[in-house]
Amino acid sequence: VLWDQGDYYNPEFKSKESNGKYVKEEGYATTLTTDHAIEFLEERDKDKPFCLLVHHKAPHRNWMPDTKYMDLYEDVEFPYPDTFNDNYATRCDAARTQEMSIDKNMTLVYDLKVDELKEKEAYKKEWNIGGWQASLDRMTPEQREAWIASYKPRNEKFINENLKGEDLVKWKYQRYIKDYVRCIKSIDDE
């Protein structure tokens, strides 16, 4: 069982073997969760009924793909959904007041992983910047190196382009959807 929603990298699991305590395990959450589920199925008493529910961390916010998929789909431009520019003005309160807008609520540092902006004044108060740093701090040196090698050049290109308005929103969507489907690829593989 993962603590809360869990972490993508080196998450903490609770099990019978850990006497109810959470223990950090090295690896990617999707792989570890699947491995634990398979282990349970292989070791269970085949004469007894059972129920196993497998709930992965992916694809929950902040959509951190496994290192082996960080560059997957990088040269693909995903189509924009028909509702991409919907402002929800004619929708019910629940839809209209939600805080899941790519334009207004998707953060550059935590959600979109532009680590280079975390010390810039405009972004220091961004929602869950501490959560982003905690995610990075969980990584092994090898995981962190892979992460930097993949994201840093793309982030620097983004910063240099200084996108605004519709161009910025489209960039946010492409970064988000690519990371989202990269996370889903890990689930598909497991």
Residue ranges with predicted function:
Residues 2-27, 42-47, 53-190:
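Active-site-proximal cap/lid insertion segments
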Residues 29-43:
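A Trp-anchored, charged/polar loop motif used as the substrate-binding/catalytic surface
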